[in-house]
Amino acid sequence: MNQTAINRADARTRFIFDDMPVRGLHVRLENVWQHIVKQKNYPAAIRCALGELLAAGVLLSGNLKNEGTLIVQVQGQGKLKMLVAEATSDRTVRATARWDETAEIADDESLGDLLGGNGVFVLTLQPKDGEPWQGVVPLEGGSIAQMLVNYMKRSEQLDTHIALSASDEAAGGLLVQRLPEEVLDEEAWEHVSTLARTLTAEELAELDAQHVLYRLFHETPPRVFEPETFESSCTCSRGKVSDMLLMLGGEEVGGVVAEQGSIEVDCDFCHSKYVFDETDVNALFGEDVVGVAKGLPRHTVQ
C-alpha cells in the first residue's frame, strides 16, 4: 500500500488491486455526519439508518461519469416514511429523514420494521446537463447494504460487496467490486470479498481508510489514490422556493397568504425558513393573486 495520507475525517478513498481486477471505495464521514445529526433529534434506529444511507450515497457517487447530483432514498409506510441522502460531483452532501414523531421507536428496531415491510429504494441521477434518470426497486434484504448489493447486481451485473455503518460520531462505508469486462477467477474474488466481510461495524465507523485497508489487505495491499474530501452543504435557496410556489399556482398560493398573512417554507435538510408575504407573492406572480383570493378585482402589479 502506498503512503498517501488517507486519514482525513470526511473523505472518500479509491483503491485498486494491481494483481487482480478488483476496485474499491472507502468512505468515512465525521464532521459532516455530526453536522447533519445536529439538525434534528433523530431516534437512534433512524439515525443509524440515515448514516448508512449517507455513506452509501457518497460511495455510489464515486461512479458518477458527469457533473451532477446523486440522490438515494428509502421510502416506507411504517413509522419511517423516508430517508434521503444527496451527494454531488462538487463533493457536498446533505441528508434528512421523515418519520412518525408520535411513534415509539426502539433503539434496535430493524429497518424492515421501521418501513412497515413495504419499503422501496429509489436512486436518482440529476446531471447538470441532460435528463435526470431514476431507478426504483423493492426493499430486499434486511439492510441498506444488502439492498444496494441486490440493486447493483441487477443494474451493473457485477459482483459487489458493500458494508455500511454509523455511530453517533461517524458514518462509514466500504465497497469492493469486480472490474467490468475483466476475467477474475472465483477463488480470487472469494478471497477479497471474504476478507472484506471480516470488517466489523465498529471498525468501519471508527477507522480511517488507511487503517481499514491495512486491517483487511495487508498481505495483498491495493494501490490507494488521493482521498476526496466532502463537506456538508445545502442547495436550498429562496429562488428554488419561488420556483416551487410558481408551480403550485397563484390561486393556491394566494389563497394561503390571504388566509394566513404569509406562506412559510422550511427546508427539510438545513431547516432554513423562507417567508413570503403578500407583497412577495404578488410580485412573484406579477398580479394581485392575494387580492383575488380575497374577492378583489384582478390586476397586475409592478
Swiss-Prot record:
Q: Answer whether the UniProt record assigns the keyword Cell wall biogenesis/degradation to this protein.
A: no
Q: How is it modified after translation?
A: Under oxidizing conditions two disulfide bonds are formed involving the reactive cysteines. Under reducing conditions zinc is bound to the reactive cysteines and the protein is inactive.
Any GO molecular function: unfolded protein binding
Q: Please classify the protein's predominant subcellular localization into one broad category.
A: cytoplasm
Record GO biological process: protein refolding
Give the keywords, sorted.
Chaperone, Cytoplasm, Disulfide bond, Redox-active center, Zinc
Which Cys-Cys disulfides exist here? C234-C236, C267-C270
What's an example GO cellular component term for this entry? cytoplasm
- Pfam family membership, one: HSP33
Is the keyword Transcription assigned to this protein? no
Q: Give compartment(s).
A: Cytoplasm
- NCBIfam families under this entry? PRK00114.1
Functionally, this protein is described as follows:
Redox regulated molecular chaperone. Protects both thermally unfolding and oxidatively damaged proteins from irreversible aggregation. Plays an important role in the bacterial defense system toward oxidative stress.
Family under the similarity heading: Belongs to the HSP33 family.
Name of the molecule in the record: 33 kDa chaperonin
Q: Which organism is it from?
A: Neisseria gonorrhoeae (strain NCCP11945)
Q: Which gene encodes it?
A: hslO
